[in-house]
UniProtKB/Swiss-Prot annotation, chain B:
Species of provenance: Thermobifida fusca (strain YX)
Location in the cell: Cell membrane
Protein name (database record): NADH-quinone oxidoreductase subunit N
Function recorded in the entry: NDH-1 shuttles electrons from NADH, via FMN and iron-sulfur (Fe-S) centers, to quinones in the respiratory chain. The immediate electron acceptor for the enzyme in this species is believed to be a menaquinone. Couples the redox reaction to proton translocation (for every two electrons transferred, four hydrogen ions are translocated across the cytoplasmic membrane), and thus conserves the redox energy in a proton gradient.
Gene: nuoN
Chain segments annotated as transmembrane: 26-46, 57-77, 96-116, 148-168, 171-191, 206-226, 253-273, 297-317, 321-341, 347-367, 375-395, 421-441, 466-486, 496-516
InterPro entries: NADH-Q_OxRdtase_suN/2, ND/Mrp_TM
GO annotations of cellular component type: plasma membrane
E.C. no: 7.1.1.-
């Protein structure tokens, strides 16, 4: 595998030369300002706060579009622009600037984040209409957008880490937004803790990079990776992967994502489907040169991706909670992207393309799920849905488009980008390529099954509603964003993939596509046909099982695979057995040692000082005569000391 | 026998010459002195109801003017001059003395604000000190609203004594300054409005023990005179290096150093000469306690530094072991006793004793860093302690309006009076030497100087003692902020503008000196010239000044 990047692609960055690009920091500053106004303004901003937040997100999006325009006006090799904001840290040789890197990769993310983010902001006006803390919710959403933009626009790992922690914070705050629900509070804590594990990996890898190269800025680091040892690069790559696993809910740090569905649904759509959870993929693609210098790390990335792809799909097949089923699907789809990112330059563009289309259709699916929940008194159990297609036509239609896109119906967005990944996997060659390829094909079949299951349980079959359910279509403020996302789910894939538009745009960063765009090959390759067949099988099996009136309202016992999948493949049990309980034991042991050992010594000293104090204060009799005597004694000591030392 | 062949030039006998006084350079002293004298005249001739306003204005203006004059003189002192002597070389004007005088005047002003504070027309002072406590006469005076405005001239004389104490250039002038400072304070201690017997007992004790210590001081002067044949610091210093008037006279010097040391150590209040401090601090009216704990301590250490650095600057090896013993005793014993104190004023008194021990480590250092460190420490501690006592005046018993000294009553104060408790918390953290407060920088400065002078064991004791003191300071903070309010919860007065200013001054100084000590250490505290800094103690030639240039 030749490195197409280290040689030339990353070599040059140019400084911003005025205009829109020089003020790229406005993209971050606007939502950050919105968050600050909403959080500091307090109740005064209740009435108009959400509109301010939307304005902030939208203007950030507009600025991103303008920046893209200016970027496209440049020659492809000049599309890496550094925007220096200010010097952040300077301690001796440790010198970090807060600089932004505007290049095709970062702009792709910026557009996705601000675009989908703005839509979800608008949707939330309707979804959170009856929540008394709506202003705080919008403040957090703005904060998230700002932090996510810091993450993707950073031109060095330190600033990236700043954004990384920022989105972690926003995610924590939003998962636990309904903190009065114990499950939400616990889920927020769980997400935070598991993410800390990944964060440590990222942090250590940044430290390693700094000690090795003396800088953490992307370009200088990538230019000198060839000079560093392969072992070191493997270590850095694996640590980066650990960070990516935490943020993107990949095995073995996947357990938090399903619980994170306790957060409000717009949060699930924006953070836990479309943007934040894809940060790990961004990290791997951005750090491409490091992984290319460490084939072992790349292999591990593909294995993690493949394993998560299957695990997420299996979990998605068994969950009755609509959001958790979709969360399993998210895991699985990010598994696709991770796998592609691990393939190296031939997979990067495919990974990013799938990431973008997934951002649209998965956000649309979540918003649809939110619309259903909104209509069904926040019921999440799909066994309590059924036959909703007639009462919620808009939701049904938009959800349906997203559904067709994700399962890979030809010429819809998901098909274009998933085919890209399948093709890249087989193209990588060798036995590994074959295995990975067939995993992605199998995944396509599983995707078709679990998504059809969701679709049929929700919108088809008999009505299994709770007695007090009175479903209705959502207001326009919610359905319009869903419609826009549905249009993206249908058409965006073709726009991005035909003639490799996105791949060519990304080429200065991730390398040019390996071969010409060939639609006929895409349609007729045996792997593509196999995926299509498996998809049809999956849909058909789901139709037989779930699109009828025999679906029980309570879940049947199920075989051991179903039980395991419901238990999220025992991920929580493993975490609890391996880490939580030993950790609690250690805590208890430490506390015991502190109580009896350390405190014993400390309180012993304190007790003896106190006893000495009680005795010494007896000298303070209150009688002037005894004070005078003490003074006389003291004078004698002073005289004797002076004489004794000098004359003896 | 001691030869009484007094040298011809130093005889302070009657001269026919009129004394040639530089009134301009003496003006900070003279202004305060004049205010005291005018205050006495005001007492004699002005109607009683108008005295309060005239006296407070007079005292504050005088102290303020004297402070400004001090600053002007700092600016007027030629840059290459180590200092000047005035009035037959009895008074010295150099940068350290001007610094000490400035600090004393600022602290006196802060204390004056507390002294002038009145609640419903009641000051902290008794209406008629001569009335027997609990008698009909006393009640009559209370009902008539009598006031002791003599307090102000007395304070003026005390402040004058403090100023002169740090500026004296010979032992006799210093002794006079000591008495001028002490006598008004003895009186002031007995003037508390509430718990008058307690206050009078404190005054009497202070007077008896102070007189006792003055006797030691005077006896020491006599011994040193016998050794050096002079009382001027420069002459004593010269004698220390040349060997004195007579062969084998060294015991005279040693006993003299020890006795003068006893007098000094009594004034700063180190173990075992500290017994008066808790009783007097507790019994005295709290504004006077604030003045004593800040101004008197600064003056006493200013004088002590001058005596030990200048007069005994050539005999460091002779007095250092003695001060080692006293410093260790002070830091250990006072810190341990403070642990079981239950009254806030007594606790602050013991705290003052421990701090005297810490500053003593800078005296032991006997180098330029020790001098600057002690100066910083004194200024920092002075403002913090004035602020702390100002807060004590605000917390009263609900039934009789006396100050609520019992610490159990302070529980939960952080909830009922958060600002007051937070201010006191800050002062306590500064006493404990926590970073970002002035106390940390001060401790660091004196300990650093002591280590540089080879007194590392002393510093180890100091740090351990700090740990013990931190315990009882933090315990009060915990009590205020994390304990349930006591049943006999005190009534917290709303600070008036006077007390509020003093507390604010304390908070501001504590934070400013803690967060930005650099400018103060560089510009405000006088620095010896770099090339002579190491040699200040050993090679002091221009002995009229604390700094050789």
């Amino acid at each position: 595998m030749t490195s197409t990047l280290a040689a030339g692609g990353y070599a040059a960055t140019t400084a911003a030369d005025g205009g829109v690009l020089s003020y790229a920091w406005l993209m971050i500053a606007l939502p950050l300002l919105g968050a600050a106004v909403l959080l500091l303004g307090g109740k005064r901003t209740n009435a108009w706060g959400h509109w301010l937040a939307i304005a902030a997100a939208l203007s950030s999006f507009v600025w991103a579009v303008l920046s893209l325009g200016q970027l496209l006006g440049r020659a492809p090799e000049e599309r890496s622009v550094t925007v220096h904001v200010y010097q952040w840290i300077k301690v001796g040789t440790f010198d970090i600037d807060l600089s932004l890197l505007i290049d095709p990769l970062s702009m792709t993310f910026a557009l996705l984040i601000t675009g989908v983010g703005s839509l979800i902001h608008i949707y939330s006006v309707g979804y959170m209409a009856h929540d008394e803390n709506r202003r705080r919710f919008f403040a957090y959403l703005n904060l998230f957008v700002a932090a996510m933009l810091v993450l993707v626009l950073a031109d060095n790992y330190a600033v990236l880490f700043l954004g990384w922690e920022g989105v972690g914070l926003a995610s924590y705050l939003l998962i636990g937004f309904w903190q009065h629900k114990p499950a939400a509070a616990v889920a927020a804590k769980k997400a935070f803790l598991i993410n800390r594990v990944g964060d440590i990996g990222l942090l250590v890898s940044i430290m390693l990079l700094f000690t090795t190269f003396g800088t953490v800025t992307f370009h200088p680091v990538f230019e000198s990776v060839d000079g560093a040892g392969r072992g070191l690069m493997t270590a850095v790559g694996l640590l980066l992967l650990l960070g990516a696993c935490g943020k993107s809910a990949q095995l073995p740090l996947q357990a938090w994502l399903l619980d994170a569905m306790e957060g409000p649904t717009p949060v699930s759509a924006l953070i836990h489907a479309a943007t934040m959870v894809t940060a790990g993929v961004y990290l791997i693609v951005r750090s491409g040169p490091i992984f290319e210098a460490a084939p072992t790390a790349q292999l591990v990335v593909t294995i993690v991706g493949a394993a998560t792809l299957l695990a997420g799909a299996i979990i998605g097949c068994a969950k009755d909670d609509i959001k958790k089923a979709l969360a399993g699907s998210t895991m699985s789809q990010i598994g696709y992207m991770t796998l592609a990112a691990g393939l190296g330059p031939i997979g990067y563009a495919a990974a990013i393309a799938h990431l973008v289309t997934h951002g649209f259709f998965k956000a649309g699916l979540f918003l649809g799920a939110g619309s259903v929940m909104h209509a069904m008194n926040d019921e999440v159990d799909m066994r309590r849905y059924g036959g909703l297609r007639t009462v919620m036509p808009v939701t049904f239609a938009t959800f349906g488009v997203g559904y067709l896109a994700i399962i890979g119906v030809p010429f819809l967005s998901g098909w274009w980008t998933k085919e890209g990944i399948i093709q890249a996997a087989f193209d990588s060659g060798g036995l590994t390529g074959q295995i990975l390829g067939w995993v992605t094909v199998l995944g396509a079949g599983l995707t078709a099954f679990y998504m059809s299951r969701i679709m049929f349980l929700t919108f088809f079959g008999t009505k299994r509603w709770a007695k007090d359910a009175n479903p209705h279509e959502s207001p326009a403020v919610m359905t319009v964003p869903m419609i826009i996302l549905a249009i993206g789910s249908a058409a965006l894939g073709a726009v991005l993939v035909v003639n490799y538009t996105l791949a060519n745009f990304l080429a200065p960063v991730v390398g040019a596509p390996a071969h010409e765009f060939d639609l006929v090959h895409m349609l007729t390759s045996p792997y593509s046909l196999a995926a299509l067949v498996l998809m049809i099988v999956g849909v058909a099996y789901a139709w037989v099982r779930y699109a009828n009136d025999k679906v029980p309202v309570t879940a049947p016992k199920g075989n051991f695979i179903t039980v395991a999948a419901r238990e999220e493949l025992y991920g929580n049990a493993i975490n609890e057995g391996l880490f939580m309980r030993p950790g609690q034991q250690l805590t208890r042991a430490t506390v015991a040692f502190d109580d009896h050992g350390v405190d014993g010594v400390v309180t012993g000293i304190a007790r003896s000082v106190r006893a000495a104090s009680e005795n010494l204060r007896l000298t303070q009799t209150g009688f002037a005569r005894s004070y005078a005597l003490t003074m006389l004694f003291g004078a004698a000591v002073v005289v004797v000391t002076t004489l004794g030392v000098n004359l003896a | 026998m001691i030869p009484l062949s007094l040298s011809e030039t130093t005889l302070p006998t009657v001269t026919t010459q009129a004394p040639d006084l530089d009134y301009w350079l003496l003006s900070p002293l003279l202004v305060v002195f004049a205010a005291g004298v005018i205050g006495v005249i005001v007492e004699a001739f002005v109607p009683a109801q108008r005295r309060y306003s005239i006296q407070t204005a007079l005292a504050m203006v005088a102290v303020g003017v004297a402070f400004v004059l001090t600053l002007v003189q700092v600016g007027a002192l030629p840059a290459d001059s180590a200092g000047l002597t005035l009035a037959f070389a009895t008074v010295v004007v150099d940068r350290p003395s001007l610094f000490f005088q400035g600090v004393i005047l600022a602290l006196a002003l802060a204390s004056l604000l507390l002294i002038a504070e009145r609640r419903d027309g009641e000051s902290a002072f008794t209406g008629q000190a001569a009335a027997v406590p609990g008698s009909e006469e006393e009640r009559a005076h209370v009902l008539a609203g009598s006031q002791h405005t003599e307090v102000y001239p007395l304070v003026m004389f005390a402040v004058l004594g403090m100023q002169l104490f740090t500026a004296a250039n010979d032992f006799l002038t210093m002794f006079i300054a000591l008495e001028v400072m002490s006598l008004p304070l003895y009186l002031l201690c007995g003037l508390a409005r509430r718990r008058r017997l307690f206050s009078q007992e404190a005054a009497l004790k202070y007077f008896l023990l102070g007189a006792f210590s003055s006797a030691f001081f005077l006896f020491g002067i006599a011994m040193v005179y016998g050794y050096a044949g002079a009382v001027e610091f420069a002459a004593v210093r010269a004698a220390g290096s040349s060997g004195g008037l007579i062969d084998g006279g060294e015991p005279l010097l040693l006993i003299g150093i020890a006795m003068i040391g006893v007098g000094m150590l009594f004034k700063v209040g180190t173990v075992p000469f500290h017994n008066w401090k808790p009783d007097v601090y507790q019994g005295a009216p709290t504004p006077i306690t604030a003045l004593m704990a800040s101004g008197t301590l600064v003056a006493a250490f200013g004088a002590m530094l001058r005596v030990f650095y200048v007069a005994f600057g050539t005999t460091v090896a002779q007095w250092r072991p003695m001060l080692w013993v006293v410093a260790i005793l002070t830091m250990v014993v006072a810190a341990v006793i403070a642990v079981t104190q239950r009254d806030i004023k007594r606790l602050l008194a013991y705290s003052s004793v421990v701090h005297a021990g810490f500053i003593l480590t800078a005296v032991v250092a006997a180098n330029a860093d020790g001098l600057t460190g002690a100066m910083f420490y004194l200024a920092a501690y002075g403002f913090t302690t004035v602020g702390a006592f100002a807060i004590v005046t605000l917390v009263r018993n609900p039934d009789n309006g006396a100050e609520a000294g019992d610490l159990t009553q302070w529980a939960g104060l952080g909830r009922t009076s958060p600002f007051l408790a937070a201010s006191l918390g800050l002062f306590l953290l500064a006493f404990a030497g926590i970073p970002l407060t002035s106390g940390f920088i001060g401790k660091f400065a004196v300990f650093e100087a002591a280590v540089a002078a080879g007194a590392t064991p002393l510093v180890v004791v100091g740090v351990l003692s700090s740990a013990v003191t931190a315990f009882f300071y933090v315990r009060i903070i915990v009590l205020m902020f994390f304990a349930e309010p006591a049943e006999n919860a005190p009534r917290v007065l709303k600070p008036g503008i006077l007390t509020g200013t003093t507390v604010g001054l304390g908070v501001a100084a504590t934070l400013l000196l803690g967060i930005l000590p650099g400018p103060v250490l560089e510009h405000v505290i006088p620095q010896p010239a770099a090339e002579t800094s190491e040699a200040v103690a050993a090679e002091h030639t221009a002995a009229d000044s604390l700094f050789a240039r």
